[in-house]
Curated annotation (Swiss-Prot):
InterPro entries: Ribo_uL30_ferredoxin-like_sf (IPR036919), Ribosomal_uL30_bac-type (IPR005996), Ribosomal_uL30_CS (IPR018038), Ribosomal_uL30_ferredoxin-like (IPR016082). GO terms for cellular component: cytosolic large ribosomal subunit. Belongs to the universal ribosomal protein uL30 family. GO terms for biological process: translation. This is Large ribosomal subunit protein uL30. It holds the Pfam family Ribosomal_L30. Part of the 50S ribosomal subunit. One of its GO terms (molecular function) is structural constituent of ribosome.
Amino acid sequence: MAKTIKVTQTRSSIARLPKHKATLKGLGLRHIRHTVELEDTPAVRGMINQVSYMVKVEE
């Protein structure tokens, strides 16, 4: 079984770079306090690093 992580959006995506909005969409986050469980892969970690100022990660 693959390790999973919980990612929660903590800040709004309004007035952000289009690239960062697309990253949130790729992570499956839609609004503030929305939480998703994702597989812990290098690709997902890279997306989280790109928008780290808008999300919280629980391992």
